[in-house]
Structure formats: C-alpha cells, structure tokens
Amino acid sequence: MKLYSRILGKGQPLLIIHGLFGMSDNWQSLAKLYADYFEVHIIDQRNHGRSPHADEFSYIHLSNDLHQYILENHLNDVIIIGHSLGGKTAMQFAVSYPELLSKLIIVDISPRFYPIHHDKIIEGLKILDFSNLKSRSQADTVLSDYIEEYDVRQFLLKSMYWKEKGQLDFRFNLKSISKNISNVGAALNDEANCSIPTLFVKGGNSNYVNDDDEDLIFKHFTNAEIQTVEQAGHWLHAEKPEEFFKKTIRFCLSY
C-alpha cells in the first residue's frame, strides 16, 4: 500500500505516525520544528487521512505499510515518533525491522493489551447522516449526544472534508476501523524485544501508561527510558507542545 505523506526539511529521516482517527495534519506544527534538524515525514496510516482504504487493519498490516514506505523512499537510520495507535505501529515495526531504525519515540501508549473503549465514539460516528449534514457544527451537535468531551469531538471533526460539492464525509475509513476495532488494543507479542534506543513519553494526567506498565516496557525495549509531560493528557503533544518538543528533540539529537 502506498501511504500518503508530507515531507519537510533535510537530513536524517524522522517519521511521525498519528493515532486512531488522526492524520498527518495533526502534527504539522511540531513537524516544522523537527524539520530544522531532520527530514520529517508525516505519514497518514492506512484507513486515515489521504492514504488508501482497506478492509484489513492490524498492527502487522500497519507495520508492513511503513516498511514498504521506507523501502520505496530509500530511507535508513530512521527515527520514528508514534502516538497511541501510531506508537503501537512503531513498536511492531521496531521488533520486525530493527535494522532500519536509529531511535524510537513512543507517545502515551505501552506494549500491553488495551480493552476496547471507543464504543461511544464509533456509535456516534456511525449515526451521522452525511446526506443531511451541511456543516461541521451540525455534526458536532449530533456527536455531542455520544461524546461529551468537546476537544475529542473537534479532533474527530478535523477529519471531515467536502468529498464533493454539498457532500461531507470523513477521511478515515470508519467501516474498516469499527470492524477491526478489537485489533487496536492488541498487545505486542510476548516474545518480542528490541534494543534500539527508545523514549516513552507519557502524559502526567493520562491513564494510558501507568507505573504497572514499566516492567513490561523494559522487558520488550531493553534500551528504553520513560519521561513524563506533567499536566498533560493523552494528546500531550498538542496540550504541551513546547515541553514535548524539548524532551523529544533532546533524545533525537543525543548519541
């Protein structure tokens, strides 16, 4: 599968992989900062953004898509930053193709299994009738009955676009994502391990990575460190971009 990407800057390749229901647009501001030091590739994963849609959606597929992208673009000594779903993709890639990697940054996700917790979001998204919706504000009103958090709704609505004149739609493939949602929480294979220098960055207010995850992180990633962005939740890179950038660029530039 040929993935869509935006490429900024020159130098060692740094790939950024978004989370579930996200897209490359979400990372543009930070990508411009990284581009002062690296050749930054902001990638749309399959079933997201401007990348192709497919029925298959698992971390093996997402990792293999990334592998194909790296080979097609003749990249090596790669640094990967992956958030949430993108972090899981990055972990799977790291244990499958370590020879292509230089460093790894995993943002607010651990290698463990996560129970399905997107039910209300998917229910709300499925209820949207695009034949009658004429604006994002109308969609937001409908979604508010299912998703209380305003910032979550606005994040989802960023993927809404004019498919054709008078016809709104989402860029993500809701049908495939909802069908395969059980794969999203999958754990890394118990035997998988990676010695690549790895930074796990978690939000201090997030419950995605907790103290109990640390042993598992160090089991799979033997050269890992864990840092916290305080007063930040799951979208720590959006909530505290300056602190997030400082922590990650320091790691990227270290030897």
Model regions: which residues?
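Conserved alpha/beta-hydrolase catalytic His-Asp/Glu region
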Residues: I116, S131-L188
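Flexible "cap/lid" loop of the alpha/beta hydrolase fold
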Residues: Q92-V95, S102-K134
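Short beta-to-alpha linker loops that shape the active-site pocket of alpha/beta-hydrolase fold enzymes
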Residues: D44-G49, S110, A232-G233
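Active-site loop/oxyanion-hole signature of alpha/beta-hydrolase fold enzymes
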Residues: K32, H41-I81, L85, K246
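Catalytic active-site module of serine/aspartate enzymes centered on a nucleophile-bearing elbow/loop
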Residues: A224-Y255
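Conserved HGGG/HGGXW glycine-rich cap/lid loop of the alpha/beta-hydrolase fold
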Residues: R6-P52
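Alpha/beta-hydrolase fold catalytic core
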Residues: M1-L15, A35-F38, N73-N76, F221-E225, ...
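Conserved serine/cysteine hydrolase catalytic core
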Residues: K165-H220, E225-T228
